[in-house]
Amino acid sequence: MSVVVLGTGRRYSSLDAYSEEFSNASGFPRIMLRMSKDQINSSWDRHTTVVDGNLSLPFSDGWGWNILMGNHVFRGLKEKLKKSIVHYTTFGLPLLTNNPDDIVTVHDLFFLDPRDEAFGGFFNLSEHFLKRFLRFNKVIAPSEYIKGELESYGFQGEITVIYMPAPIEIQYLNNKEEARKMMGLPNDKKLVLSISSSLRRKNLPVVEKTMKILGDEYKLVRVGPPISNALNYRGLAPEKINMIYNACDVLLFPTLGEGYGKPVVESFASGLPVVTSDIQIMREIADDAAILVEPVPEKCAEAIRISIDSEYEYRKRGFEKTKTYSREKFISAVNKYYTAVSQATGI
């Protein structure tokens, strides 16, 4: 059996981590395409093959161009992929093969929502990129929620849900004081963690308003694009992210929509209580291991107080829920899936 895990994204990004996990779980090679200027400084270890697209365009960051012109830009790689099953770990990649038995992961469909930044209006580029891959027979989805969204969209092929585990570096350390010392965080505050991009659906205004309600006893720790009056971090390696999780008292994740909810799963693995939105995807991923609320400031603030007062209980629930997303289950699911694809195709 020969499978190639094809990915893109900055080092330590969610997309990078996703392709790395599938490659590590299966032992199959990973190829990372550097397709935009923000990936120029990303580098990987010797176990990952890196192929550069055109990163010197004066009129573009390169991403759209390298997808649309991928068959030309990556023509050498295209030849090498002909004898393998290719797992495209995002549809934001150039389509380099014509094998309907290849695999694509669809992480979300938010670009179909007119309220989302990715919605293309008259011409939806993301939808155009997606449709190229829906000629495949097989799709991997990160959650049952996204599987349902794909079915509603009209995809009639085989959709398999494979839950991602927390990164191996994310674990409970049982030493909050030491974690705070290592990350330069105060010991005299209750620390609320916010970790996300700045997309509208991440609902960051609610995070800011919630902190104002909570008052001076609390301090916001922010991983991602900065928020005013927070202790801000960006570009952290997984080991540092783990220190942040272990240093904080609660994760506030008032999202309006997710394909999976990686920070929630990571919080469970690190023993951090979670306050998140009472929406379909969070009911699937978190269930009663988190406090689910309407994502408005007043209810978030109340839930944060409850979660900190009941820290032990929610830590215990989180650890129990983590079994659903265990590394052992993930490795088994990945290898079972790749083996079935190989047997069906004869590759």
Give the ranges of each region predicted by the language model.
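Carbohydrate transferase catalytic cores enriched for Leloir-type hexosyltransferases
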Residues: 1-347
